[in-house]
A protein has these predicted regions:
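Short, basic/aromatic recognition patches that contact phosphate-bearing ligands
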Residues: 1-102, 184, 336-346
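A generic structural signal for beta-strand entry/edge sites
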Residues: 20, 164, 202, 292-299
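Polybasic (Lys/Arg-rich)
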Residues: 245-346
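A residue-level signal for conserved active-site and pocket-lining positions in enzyme catalytic cores
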Residues: 9, 96, 162, 196, ...
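Residue-level recognition of well-ordered beta-strand positions that form the cores
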Residues: 12, 23, 168-170, 267-271, ...
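Bulky hydrophobic/aromatic content
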Residues: 81-178
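Core beta-strand-centered patch of the WYL/Sm-like small regulatory domain
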Residues: 139-266
Length: 346
């Protein structure tokens, strides 16, 4: 009986309290008596003592005084301001929920289910303030791959077992349907999966295509019909440029838009008001120097194609200064764009 009382106390406090919404012992006793009218104050007091003595394990705490005078004649001890230290703060849950809510590749119906599960991790006060109507107002017109979570499960299992996978890789057509990139719709690419990462709202598989010796990455929401092959995964140290192992953090820092190519040292000059945007893109992996006259010099190490797209998007704020071949590529892209717009006006 005592063991079940401990569970009931934790359950009630977890559902109804947090540090900002504590509960009095007498209110806790009232909740318990809805299930067992015979339970008494002393039994509850002793059980709370047990839980509070192991607060690091039970997550049960109390604030304020340990005695609550209900009347001049009542000198019995009561705990006040009891609460359960929730595993997630409201801010942490909101951050997780918004990440799912605005994800561009999670099927709409799955968002509803996942967010419902996340809401259950909070107490009644959190759920009262977190309206599920918000998700149902979102448009359901994002093109989706219904196999996304199946893909994640299978890839995760393959990585745990150290096995290769086979997968059909697709592109999205103008009708928002997926079509295999190869003429043979049943052709499965043989891949060595190493990690799954999120970038720019999309989930990527960092992998190696088995008949090559370099690292690459595929959009997981563009993959279909994934199967686990009964073949051991290729050791990452066998890949070009990864003989010392695979540092996923380093890989992500050098692939800002998950483009293809080897990181290259690139220098550019930028308006100093662009510094916040540069930091948003490159994080701490940019080196700033010689900030004067409203300009700053910058150095990054990213694939040239990545930098090409970024520089074109920000051509009014940044000027690439090296390498020369990247400058030539940017000039060519700008000339081509200018020719198109000039032709439109003539």
């Amino acid at each position: 009986m005592k063991k079940y009382l401990h569970f009931d106390l934790i359950r009630i406090l977890k559902e109804n309290t947090d540090r900002a919404h504590p509960m009095l012992q007498k209110d806790l006793l009232a909740e318990l008596r809805k299930k067992d009218e015979k339970i008494n104050r002393t039994t509850v007091w002793n059980a709370l003592n047990d839980l509070l003595a192991k607060s690091q394990e039970t997550r049960i705490h109390h604030l304020g005084e340990e005695a609550e005078a209900t009347s001049e004649k009542d000198t019995r001890q009561y705990y006040t301001n009891l609460y359960y230290d929730q595993e997630f703060t409201d801010a942490e849950l909101r951050w997780l929920i918004d990440g799912i809510l605005y994800s561009r590749n999670v099927p709409h119906a799955d968002r509803d289910v996942i967010i419902g599960k996340l809401c259950e991790l909070g107490n009644q006060h959190f759920r009262k303030n977190m309206s599920m109507k918000k998700i149902r107002r979102l448009s359901d017109d994002e093109p989706m791959n219904e196999e996304l979570f199946r893909n994640i499960d299978i890839i995760g299992k393959a990585m745990q077992e150290g096995k290769k996978i086979g997968a059909v890789y697709n592109y999205m057509g103008p009708d928002f349907e997926l079509y295999p990139v190869y003429d043979d719709p049943d052709y499965h690419q043989l891949l060595n999966p190493y990690a799954m990462v999120m970038r720019n709202g999309f989930y990527f598989l960092i992998c190696n295509k088995d008949n090559y010796d370099d690292m690459t990455h595929y959009r997981i929401d563009r993959m279909t019909d994934i199967i686990i092959e009964e073949k051991p995964i290729k050791p990452v140290r066998d890949l070009k440029d990864f003989h010392d192992g695979f540092d996923i953090q380093n890989y992500m820092e050098h692939n800002i838009n998950m483009a293809f190519g080897k990181p290259t040292r690139i220098t550019f000059q930028a308006n100093d008001y662009a510094i916040p945007s540069i930091i948003d893109t490159f994080g701490k992996n940019v080196i700033f120097s010689n900030q004067k006259d409203g300009k700053v010099e910058c150095v990054v190490n990213v694939p040239k194609y990545d930098m090409l797209r970024w520089a074109l998007q920000n051509c009014d704020q940044v000027t690439i200064t090296s390498p020369v071949e990247l400058i030539s590529d940017i000039k060519e892209c700008l000339r081509h764009a200018l020719d198109i717009y000039v032709a439109q006006q003539s």
